[in-house]
Amino acid sequence: MKKIIYLVAAFLCMACSDDHGSNQENGGASGSVTEVTPVTSDLSVDLSTDKAFYKPGEKVVFTADDALPAGTKVRYRLLGEVVGEESVVNGTSWTWQPPTTDFKGYMAELYRQENGTDVIVGTIAVDVSSDPARFPRYGFVADFSREKTAEKTQEEMAYLNRHHINWVQFQDWHNKHHWPLGGTRTQLDEVYMDIANREVYTSSVKNYIEAQHRFGMKSMFYNLCFGALKDAATDGVKEEWYLFKDASHTTKDSHDLPGGWKSNIYLVDPSNKEWQKYLNERNDDVYANFAFDGYQIDQLGRRSTLYNYNGIPVNLREGYASFIEATKQAHPDKSLVMNAVSRYGARQIGETGKVDFFYNEVWADEADFTNLKAILYENGVYGNYQLNTVFAAYMNYNKADNRGEFNTPG
């Protein structure tokens, strides 16, 4: 529901290493002196690749934004080791076949030689991974208006591709939380309204998916695991599925939204088997019409004590695990990621073994780097050290207009 400005992942530089921690980057044999070529930079060439990541054995296509002068060379590095070098003879585009070792990251350096000095004119990284979940770099899209044509979405995804974004979340793309499709399985609406009563064009959603897949990205549709709108009963959602603030099922729990929006969101029990079956059928409708690669599951963090229809207190954390298990069973070939809002339910989410990586939305009470360190440590334990972590990073509007500096662009 929030405007996520960037979704920052476990870092690509983790891939840019050898598995043995070697520190012999540039040194020669013991006691010898290695001749070092001076290096400087003049980063005047913008580079791009044709994909966000490459499976072992796939060829990389590089493109420069302008014709390169004669004598331009490119070398490929794995940390300090040069694993390949060649002249660029085709003006603006060339290909490279990386080593087939899985889960490695490389730096391509475009350079020219001047008076014995290597002048680097452009750089770009290459991720070679059979599974993008190993090094997830998560972006998002949130505007599905008429203007999102095939040409426009291709341009936007080219920008994300340049940042090596390999997963993309579709924020608030759906019609209703309990009925994601605009229309029905057999008859889609050309245009429908999202939760904020903004127009969503079905063609725009499809344009984004197609553009992302051209770059090898994974497309993930967003939805709560337990949301229903005010008209849910007409769509088959039962009263007995809801979460209540009292044991006598008088007051439903809800997430209240601004006036003028489509509806408040009323919460159902994510562990309710009938609800799980219902929503998985709706998800099946989604997959039948859109080439999504998986489901970005959301929650709302810690709630007060809640009860099911029978007056029994509900353990939401365990309910999330049950929901994930049922969702994976219904669509075993689709990816799952679930938001652990302020760590809530992170252990239960990770211990299912059914999510592709951890996703943590961190709020003001966990604003220090020590908090991020603690989350990374906990997620390592919960995921048996097999899953990486993505943090949802929100724009600091007080600093947004200030330019900063960063390392050599990759």
Kindly label every feature range from the protein language model.
Residues S130-P136, A142-A150, F221-F290:
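Active-site-adjacent "subsite" loops/lids of carbohydrate-active enzymes
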Residues H174-V205, A233-P270, G301-E318:
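Aromatic- and acidic-residue-enriched carbohydrate-binding clefts of CAZyme catalytic domains
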Residues V121-K176:
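An acidic-aromatic substrate-binding cleft motif
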Residues M338, G353-K354, F369-G410:
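Active-site-proximal substrate-binding groove within the catalytic cores of carbohydrate-active enzymes
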